[in-house]
Amino acid sequence: MSALLRLLRTGAPAAACLRLGTSAGTGSRRAMALYHTEERGQPCSQNYRLFFKNVTGHYISPFHDIPLKVNSKEENGIPMKKARNDEYENLFNMIVEIPRWTNAKMEIATKEPMNPIKQYVKDGKLRYVANIFPYKGYIWNYGTLPQTWEDPHEKDKSTNCFGDNDPIDVCEIGSKILSCGEVIHVKILGILALIDEGETDWKLIAINANDPEASKFHDIDDVKKFKPGYLEATLNWFRLYKVPDGKPENQFAFNGEFKNKAFALEVIKSTHQCWKALLMKKCNGGAINCTNVQISDSPFRCTQEEARSLVESVSSSPNKESNEEEQVWHFLGK
């Protein structure tokens, strides 16, 4: 545990508002050959947006147009590194929203056309997650699986709570610090059922399929074996992270037990079905923006020219009023 605490205390410089880049190792080079990002506005400002393009340079929605699962057709013959044949069927695309050790709460803008990544704004202010001793920012590379949706009108059969109206979240536990906007391939290991203000907010535990240690990880027990203390720290982080903002501790289904890979895959399957209903206009999506360019039978599909017009309507001018959160440590005693 002492080794884990030393690791968690090692954070990025306070001035690093947002880590951006196009590559962070073998897996990222492969993924970024398929997807690219384009910034508009200035990081750490309310007008900042990070849009996505496919390999041909056309704008896409990361929420809707990036496939949930990795497959040979999508990869165009690019070989996987160290992936076992029986695991290849369970490789998923993950969109990285928040690099490990950073505080800016970046998220896919589900209610905006083309769903760029932006920084979450609450009460007119940019949202930053607090540093709770001994942690620094997010303690994993944090992001989401595309083509998933936790339906706010449907009770989860496991938690008996409605969904949180977002794609399913992922905590990537690999050895590399990734970049906002990267699309990587991950192996699913398990899942945690967070109940956030009465809503189901699943947290997948996964590892980059091209991480140097990925071959050792196949299920949730491998996390306990090879990264002792990490799951306990994850549970504690999610329990406390809203307390500095004056909110109560979060609760969990299953008494905070991490469920295994098989359970996690069923949850992913369910959220993917909810997303399909959303894109086919078979359920109430509310304010969710379903504009896409690649889902052929979706009534929300638009042309490449229309997608370009939507992106170009967003201001690309730098905002001089960028703001970085003051870095303080919160000590929460019991």
UniProtKB/Swiss-Prot annotation:
Modified residues (N6-succinyllysine): K216, K259
Keyword Magnesium: yes
Gene Ontology MF term list: inorganic diphosphate phosphatase activity; magnesium ion binding; protein serine/threonine phosphatase activity
InterPro entries assigned: Pyrophosphatase, Pyrophosphatase_sf
Protein keywords: Acetylation, Disease variant, Hydrolase, Magnesium, Metal-binding, Mitochondrion, Phosphoprotein, Transit peptide
Expressed in which tissues: Detected in brain, gastric carcinoma, lung, ovary, skeletal muscle, umbilical cord blood and a cell line derived from kidney proximal tubule epithelium.
Associated clinical condition: Sudden cardiac failure, alcohol-induced: An autosomal recessive disease characterized by sudden death due to unexpected cardiac arrest following ingestion of small amounts of alcohol.
Residue positions, PTM Phosphoserine: S317
Source organism (scientific name): Homo sapiens (Human)
EC number: 3.6.1.1
Official protein name in the record: Inorganic pyrophosphatase 2, mitochondrial
Catalytic activity field: diphosphate + H2O = 2 phosphate + H(+)
Range annotated as the organelle transit peptide: 1-32
Statement: the UniProt record of this protein carries the keyword Acetylation: yes
